[in-house]
């Protein structure tokens, strides 16, 4: 009896994490994991790197036509890196447009994620910044190179395990 109660409690908790987008992705048989809602009520989903392209295309077809932001962060020293996508459904009569947040976690030893540049052009500079600061390689990105740091810079400055060089070479800005 206790096992049945534990299973039903887990199902209730899992259903509390699912929103409209998660239910729609389940209907479309697209792999993801619901992570719940943030403090503003935005649904958050985890997607594996190998499933990102199919999920992103489906979300674009569903109406998420605007990539509001893409960012990255270092989960923990020596741990995974995360790439985060904030998508918005922009249409003519939306006072409160629907939003969704997609998180992709990759190991720091092989941080490769497919680029969404071909779906949302606004990913161009944002993916480049994530590459420059964290070393996440966005496979298929047409201009993936450093955007903030000099081309010859060694390392990824926003990683938690980054060791700051002893000196910096000052360069002219022109």
From Swiss-Prot:
Transmembrane segments: none annotated. Gene3D superfamilies: NADH:ubiquinone oxidoreductase, 30kDa subunit (3.30.460.80). SUPFAM superfamilies: Nqo5-like. It comes from the Eukaryota. It is an enzyme of class 7 (translocase). It holds the Pfam family Complex1_30kDa. GO terms for biological process: photosynthesis, light reaction. It is found in: Plastid, Chloroplast thylakoid membrane. GO terms for molecular function: NADH dehydrogenase (ubiquinone) activity; quinone binding. InterPro entries: NADH_DH_suC, NADH_quin_OxRdtase_su_C/D-like, NADH_UbQ_OxRdtase_30kDa_su, NADH_UbQ_OxRdtase_CS. The keyword NADP applies. NDH shuttles electrons from NAD(P)H:plastoquinone, via FMN and iron-sulfur (Fe-S) centers, to quinones in the photosynthetic chain and possibly in a chloroplast respiratory chain. The immediate electron acceptor for the enzyme in this species is believed to be plastoquinone. Couples the redox reaction to proton translocation, and thus conserves the redox energy in a proton gradient. NDH is composed of at least 16 different subunits, 5 of which are encoded in the nucleus. HAMAP family: NDH1_NuoC. This is NAD(P)H-quinone oxidoreductase subunit J, chloroplastic. It comes from Mesostigma viride. The lineage of its organism: Eukaryota, Viridiplantae, Streptophyta, Mesostigmatophyceae, Mesostigmatales. The gene is ndhJ.
């Amino acid at each position: 009896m206790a096992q049945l109660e534990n299973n039903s409690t887990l199902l209730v908790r899992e259903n509390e994490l699912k929103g409209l987008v998660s239910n729609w992705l389940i209907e479309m048989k697209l792999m993801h994991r619901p992570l719940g809602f943030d403090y503003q009520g935005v649904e958050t989903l985890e997607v594996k790197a190998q499933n990102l392209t199919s999920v992103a295309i489906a979300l674009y077809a569903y109406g998420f036509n605007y990539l509001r932001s893409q960012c990255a962060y270092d989960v923990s020293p020596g741990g995974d890196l995360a790439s985060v996508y904030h998508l918005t459904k922009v249409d003519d009569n939306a006072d409160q447009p629907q939003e969704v947040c997609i998180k992709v976690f990759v190991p720091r030893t092989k941080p490769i994620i497919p680029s969404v540049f071909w779906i949302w052009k606004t990913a161009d500079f944002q993916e480049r910044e994530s590459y420059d600061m964290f070393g996440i390689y966005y496979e298929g990105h047409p201009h993936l190179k450093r955007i903030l740091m000099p081309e010859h810079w060694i390392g990824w400055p926003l990683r938690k395990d980054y060791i700051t060089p002893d000196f910096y070479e000052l360069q002219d800005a022109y």
